Regions:
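Small-residue-enriched flexible segments
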Residues: 1-35, 40-60, 64-332, 337-345, ...
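ATP-binding catalytic core of ATPases
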Residues: 361
Length: 399
C-alpha cells in the first residue's frame, strides 16, 4: 500500500486550501482503490471542503475534527487540514457511517453497517478503521460498546483502530466525517481487505498515582454508581474533588482513574479512564470508557515527563519492529489522547519532536489528538492482541 500525507494551514479560504492539497498530491500515483483519512480543526467548514475535494476525488473520505495534528515534517499543528491518502491495487475499502447512536439502538446500527460494508468487499476484512464522538451525555455510547458490537459482527480476530473526535477543549464542537456527512454521535467505519497486515503499538502515559483506592461495588458499562459503601460522588467529595456540576470532563482531564481489567484468555492489563459526567441526583459517575464492577480505582497523575517517555517508548518499539520486518510497511497512523497534549503545557511540540528525530524519510505519518483511542492491546501473558478502547494512551498503527 502506498501513501502520502497532505497538509494546509488554510481553513478560511477553502478553495485556496483545496488547491494546495491537490498540488501536493499531483505527483502521487493513485492506484485502483484509495481511501482518504482527514483531520481538521473544529472551525473547518467540512461540507464545503468535501464538496470541493469530491469535485476531483471520487474515493471515500473518513475522519474527524481534532484539537491538534501530528505530521512528519510540520510536527504538531493546532490549525489546518491534514489528509492521509492510502492507495493500493491489492486492497479494497468499504466505508460508511451510522445514524446518531444512543443506548437504545446502537447495536442494531453498528451491526447493520458492518454487515453491509462487509458485503461490499471482495474478500474478508483484515482491518477496521473507525471514528466516533465522545460520551457527552448518559445516552452516548462508550467506545468499549462499539468495539464489542464490531467484534460480534465481524469476529474478534480483525483489529479495530481509530479514535474519538476532539475540539479545542470546548467538548461540544467536535465532529465525525464520512463522505458528505457529519455527526457528533454517529460512528464512521472503514473496512479494509486484501494485502494488509498492520502492526500496532500502545503505550500508557500514567505512571504516578495517589495512595487512595476504591473498590467499584456497583457499575454498568461506563457508569459507576457506588465505590465501597457510598456513591461515586460521595467518594469524590471525600477527596475534595469537583462534584458541583454535571459536565466535568475538563475538570478531570489531567486526573485519570487507573484500574486493572481482564482482557480474556488470562491477560490482565492496567488501563486508565476519563471521567466525563456526574449525575448529581443519583451520585453516579459516567466515564468515557467502561469501568467494570469489582475493579479497584486509583487516581492517577498525568505529567509531562511520563508523556514524553511513553512517546519515546512507542516509536522506539515500532521502528525496531519494522526494522525486522519485510520493509513494506511505510505508513504510520497515530492517535494520542488530548489530555497528553494538555499535560505538555507550553511544550506542546514535544511529542512531535520525539519522532521527528528518528523517523526514516520514506515513511508517511499522520496523527491526531482525540478523546479516546481504539487500538489492539497485546496481552502480557499470551502475546495475543485484544481489541480495546483506551484513554490517556499513545497508539501507532503501521501499514
Amino acid at each position: 500500500m502506498d501513501s502520502i500525507v497532505l497538509y494546509t494551514e488554510e481553513i478560511d479560504d477553502l478553495e485556496e486550501a483545496v488547491g494546495e492539497l491537490f498540488t501536493q498530491a499531483d505527483t502521487f500515483a493513485l492506484k485502483k482503490n484509495t481511501l482518504a483519512v482527514l483531520f481538521a480543526e473544529e472551525d473547518t467548514d467540512y461540507p464545503e471542503l468535501y464538496k470541493l475535494l469530491s469535485a476531483r476525488w471520487d474515493f471515500p473520505i473518513i475522519g474527524s475534527t481534532t484539537m491538534a495534528m501530528l505530521l512528519a515534517e510540520q510536527g504538531c499543528c493546532r490549525t489546518g487540514i491534514s489528509i492521509l491518502l492510502l492507495t493500493a491495487d491489492d486492497c479494497a475499502f468499504a466505508v460508511g457511517m451510522t445514524d446518531d447512536l444512543n443506548k437504545d439502538h446502537y447495536r442494531e446500527e453498528i451491526t447493520n453497517l458492518c454487515a453491509s460494508l462487509q458485503k461490499e468487499l471482495p474478500t474478508p476484512p483484515k482491518l477496521v478503521l473507525t471514528y466516533g464522538g465522545m460520551v457527552a451525555s448518559e445516552e452516548n455510547v462508550p467506545g468499549d460498546e462499539v468495539v464489542s458490537v464490531i467484534e460480534a459482527t465481524l469476529g474478534k480476530d480483525i483489529p479495530v483502530y481509530g479514535g474519538i473526535a476532539s475540539d479545542g477543549f470546548s467538548f461540544n464542537n467536535y465532529r465525525v466525517f464520512c463522505g458528505d456527512r457529519t455527526t457528533q454521535s454517529g460512528q464512521a467505519i472503514a473496512l479494509v481487505s486484501g494485502n494488509i497486515d498492520p502492526i500496532f503499538i500502545t503505550t500508557n502515559s500514567v505512571e504516578n498515582r495517589a495512595d487512595v483506592t476504591y473498590e467499584v461495588t456497583k457499575a454498568q458499562s461506563n457508569k459507576v454508581m457506588r465505590l465501597g459503601t457510598g456513591t461515586f460522588i460521595d467518594a469524590l467529595r471525600r477527596e475534595n474533588m469537583e462534584v458541583s456540576k454535571q459536565n466535568v470532563v475538563g475538570d478531570y482531564f489531567l486526573s485519570p482513574f487507573v484500574l486493572s481489567i481482564d482482557l480474556g484468555d488470562g491477560d490482565i492489563s492496567e488501563i486508565t479512564r476519563t471521567l466525563s459526567l456526574l449525575n448529581l441526583e443519583t451520585g453516579t459517575g459516567v466515564f468515557l470508557g467502561e469501568v467494570p464492577e469489582g475493579s479497584i480505582l486509583r487516581i492517577g497523575i498525568l505529567n509531562r515527563k511520563d508523556v514524553q517517555k511513553s512517546v519515546e517508548q512507542a516509536f522506539g518499539e515500532i521502528l525496531e519492529t519494522l526494522s525486522r520486518s519485510d520493509g513494506k510497511r511505510r505508513t504510520l497512523l497515530c492517535h494520542s489522547c488530548a489530555a497528553r497534549f494538555l499535560a505538555m503545557a507550553s511544550n506542546t511540540k514535544a511529542e512531535a519532536e520525539t519522532y521527528q528525530s528518528c523517523l526514516p524519510e520514506a515513511f508517511s505519518l499522520l496523527g491526531m489528538y482525540g478523546n479516546g483511542e481504539f487500538c489492539p492491546l497485546r496481552g502480557e501473558k499470551t502475546g495475543k492482541n485484544h481489541n480495546f478502547f483506551h484513554n490517556f494512551t499513545f497508539t501507532i498503527m503501521a501499514i
